Amino acid sequence: MVRRHFPGRAIVKVLTSHGYRLVGREGSHVRLRWDPPDQHDSAVRLVSVPVGHEVGGDTLRNIADQCGADDFDAFCTWIERNR
């Protein structure tokens, strides 16, 4: 079964190690930005991640959507494998 709860800091660590960069902080949330390579047809992605607690449920699903994930379970597996 796929794990669906992760510490916010672990999510930030995985995303920043895969091209996202920290662009701001508001309260307990950090803002990350991914700029696509020139040959990529995707738009810039902005992601907000709460870092003070475990992230799961709809919040984790929203983060996956903001990252452009098509498959939520695959996104969770990717986070688990890279944390």
Task: Go through each PLM region and give its residues.
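Short, mixed charged/polar active-site loops
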Residues: 44-46
